[in-house]
Structures are given as structure tokens and as C-alpha cells.
Curated annotation (Swiss-Prot):
EC number(s) on file: 2.3.2.27
Catalytic reaction equation(s): S-ubiquitinyl-[E2 ubiquitin-conjugating enzyme]-L-cysteine + [acceptor protein]-L-lysine = [E2 ubiquitin-conjugating enzyme]-L-cysteine + N(6)-ubiquitinyl-[acceptor protein]-L-lysine
InterPro entries: MKRN-like, MKRN1_C, Znf-CCCH_4, Znf_CCCH, Znf_CCCH_sf, Znf_RING, Znf_RING/FYVE/PHD, Znf_RING_CS
Superkingdom, natural source: Eukaryota
Name this polypeptide is given: Probable E3 ubiquitin-protein ligase makorin-1
Coiled-coil region list: none
Pfam families, per the entry: MKRN1_C, zf-CCCH_2, zf-CCCH_4
Feature: compositional bias, Low complexity: 358-368
Positions of region (Disordered): 73-118, 352-371
Gene3D superfamilies documented for this protein: Zinc finger, CCCH-type, Zinc/RING finger domain, C3HC4 (zinc finger)
GN (gene name): mkrn1
GO molecular function: ubiquitin protein ligase activity; zinc ion binding
Zinc finger boundaries on the chain: C3H1-type: 18-45, 48-74, 163-190, 319-348
Gene source species: Danio rerio
Amino acid sequence: MAEAAAASTAAPAVIGGWTKHVTCRYFMHGLCKEGENCRYSHDLSSCKQTMICKFFQKGCCAFGDRCRYEHTKPSKQDEVPSSKPSMPLTAAPLAGTPEPVSDGPGGTTGAQEKPQGSGAVDWVNAAEFVPGQPYCGRADPVLCEGPGPLIEEEYEKEQANKEMKKQLCPYAAVGECRYGLNCAYLHGDVCDMCGLQVLHPSDTSQRSQHIRACIEAHEKDMEISFAIQRSKDMMCGVCMEVVFEKTNPSERRFGILSNCCHCYCLKCIRKWRSAKQFESKIIKSCPECRITSNFVIPSEYWVEDKEEKQQLIQKYKDGMGTKPCRYFDEGRGTCPFGANCFYKHAFPDGRLEEPQPQRRQNGSNGRNRNTRRTHLWDLLDERENSDSFDNEDEEMVRFELSEMLLMLLAAGTDDDVTDSEDEWDLFHEELDDYYELYL
């Protein structure tokens, strides 16, 4: 029992004995939480040399003075790794080294007379054993003065390329970088247009491209400012309210008539054109000047200039042309507007519908009339010959009448004003006769 107790008391000393000769790496950086109870040595006099910060050597240490590593550039002797003591060479002599020559029977060799210092061949520190060094062989160095300037020029070009490849700091480009001078990225020059550090100091193409983009953005902002200045006092001709001062933000939009320059808000002009108690030629005309406009263009700003209005109309048509037509339905249906439809007529495979020629015939007054009403006359003749019809037939008739109305709306854009009025008069007469006879 006594022997076991003695062994147990001696065990900790044996286990912790070798650790006291090893310096605590946490204590070296001031982070050891064990304190005096640490089983490693806290004696800095016996520790190795402090580690050198590799980021400081590259010039991009983000910690600065607070870095735990040493901020000193090592000398050339420190860069070469420490080697073990050189052992005597027992193999054949190296190439380029003279063989020992004896002076006499009892004399010493020439190699033994040379000191073991700088004159001796240090094969451990040879170029092929140093990491990262190119192999140069053991031949004697040859001095040449020619390639010196060329090497300097290549070094300058390499440094210039490295400078070009540096990326701009994303934080400094949008505001402020918290790293300041210790930032690993490049802080660009301040742009006079946007006031941000986004100009690369040495990349001229990037500077010109950014300045050009800033000028374009500034021009767009100026156009928007002029549009707001032009639109802020415009008053709707129906509700007599300033469009930009409406209570509901969704109603602060203009309804631009295609053939008229009078100002209306989009809600009022759409309500005017959807009225049922007036004739179509009345609701399609301007409430003030009575000029007929085939469509209304929604706009956030007021547009009065002819060129700007044409650009707005073309932009509106291009935007509508990207949406598929629900009447065409990818070729499964028929669009009453035909080639005059603003929406996209495309088949499932992506092919666009080819415009079909419109069949026309001459009327009694010498003007061309659309033959699309013939289907309605056939329908009326069929209803006259039949006795009565149920609700399904009535719904079908209403559908045919609505389709005929859409056809006439589309056809009215091709004819002049007088011809369009004749079309509408004839259509209303057909409707009156039909409702008097059957409904």
C-alpha cells in the first residue's frame, strides 16, 4: 500500500515535468486563461523568436499596431531556414570543387588548410534545398552588366500590372471604409459627379467608363426633373383637380390622348370613354375639342411635345407587344382587331402570326366598306327564319354582337373620319332593328 501511494504521488510530477520546458503559446500572445495553474512554461526568456506577421510583409495587415505578431521585415539571413550542423562529406567531391592535394607524405591536404567558414562549400544552404528558389546549379557565378536594366524594366512592368489588378474597395466605393489605410483593397479617387471613391488611380478605361455612366445618369435625372416641373401644375379637364395633388397616389397619372393635347387624369378619361349613355363617336372624342383619339396612353408625367408623344406612343405599343393577346390565345382563338391589335400574336412554338389581307368591297357611295358585318347579317337572317330561341342562343347572339363591335372598332382606324361615322351609324341601325324584332 505504501508503495502504491508513493507511485501515485510521484505520477503527476512525471507527467507534467516535460511540459514545463515548453513555452505556452497562449501566454506568448497574452491569452492564457489558466494563469499559474497552466502546466506549460510562462518563461518568455526561453521561448523562440517571435513570429513575423506575413500580412505585414505583404503590406496589408488589417490589425496594425494591435497585431499580435511582430511587424518587422526579416533580413536575408532570417529568410533562410535554420539548418543543422554540416556533416563531413564522405561521398565523391562535388562538381566544381577542387580535390584535396597532399603536400607530401606527412603533410596536410589543401582542403584541410581551408577554414570551415565562408570558404567551405555549404551544401545544406544550396539553392536546390532552399524552398521557393530556382535551381541554379553549382557553377561559379558569371557577372554580366547587360541584363541589369532589362530586369529592372520587367520588374517595373510587373509592379504596374499588380497595381492594375488591385480591386477597388467595395466599402469605400459606396461610402466609408472602416479599415482606412490598413485596407487590403485599393481606395479609388473621388468622382466629381457622384462624390464616391470609385475611380481607379491607374485604369484609364475604368475611369472614362464610370464618368460616362455618371453623365448619362445625370442627364436622366435632369429629364425627370424637367418632367416633374412641367407636370406639377397640370389640371384635369374633367374633375378639375391638379393631378399631382390627388389624395390617392395611384390616381396621380395622366391619360394622354393620341390625337389631342388636352390634359386629363387617367381615371377620368377612362371613365369618360367607358360611358354607355353616349354614342361611340362621342366617347372616343376629346371632351373639350371633340377630336377623335383611338386610344389612351397612361403616363406618369405630362407630355405635350409631338416628338415626346410619339416616343411615348411607340414605347407604349412596344410594351403591349410583349404581352400575349388573350383573344388570339396562341392560335386557338380569333382576335377581332387583327393586325391592328397592340398585343402579341404568337403561336406556342414562338412563330408570329402573319398579317392577313383585309377583304373590302365598294359601297354605294364609292367608298370602301368592311365585309366583316356579313356574319352579323347571316345571323340576323337565321334568326328571322326561326321561331324562337332559348337563353343559350341569346348569349351566343350577344357574344357575336360584341365581337362585331370589336371588329368595327379595329376597322375604324383604317378609314377616314367620315367613313368611320358611316360604319358606326350602320352598326347602330342594325342593333336597333335587332333589338326591336327579337329582344
